[in-house]
Amino acid sequence: IVERLRFLSAVGLGYLQLQREMHSLSRGEAQRVAMTSIAGSNLVNTLFVIDEPSAGLHLRDVSRVVSIVRDIRDSGNTVVVVEHEREFLNAADHVLDIGPAAGRDGGKLVYAGDTDALAAVAESATGRWLAGTATRETGSEHTAARGSTCRQARGWLQLSDATFHTVKDCSVKFPLGVLCVVTGVSGAGKSSLIESVLFPAVCKELEQSCSVAVVGEYGGLKGADSISSVELIDDRPLAGSRRSNPAT
């Protein structure tokens, strides 16, 4: 329990009283509680899919959540995060930019690589934003957020012909053993790709139950045999009793 409380404090939830019931938490609070549960679980060789962990966070707390996500990665796991916060982009070992715009003009892989090179991609709205804000941050701050170097992938998950909502026949490679951030403008199809196609696809390959009710289609998935399990962390309530509290 002491270790769990340490994680809760680390993600800015030190103000929660232990008698507070889970169903009374906000979406952002519930998601961060779920993250602390995962961080203290000692799971390894697991793919963690996290949808916008910075949602509802004060800027001062974003770095704390980034630290927890990096701890999960450093324990021997793969983390795929849907995010747009600059601090997450800086911390990423690998970035996937979905776009180039929203709706019918989205759902395509615009860029795959490290954060630094994304700023030079003219087609990417995220890249243009990064280029415009580059002067606000020093190189040392960037390095501190990510670490001394980008981690190299120990393998790849290859998802082909993903289709759901705005995502049409999109083929993407996800690096294993690193922190991979999936970014792009709102409505580009980030969550559709990750939550509604990638996560269910891996669940199917691993013969693991899937918590997503409506799933997309895909042509194939390679590399799932390199991971042991997959976990989705979003804003849905944790499974368990309505009387569960943040410490349990």
Can you say where each PLM-predicted feature lies in the sequence?
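Conserved phosphate-binding elements of NTP-dependent enzyme cores
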Residues: 1-248
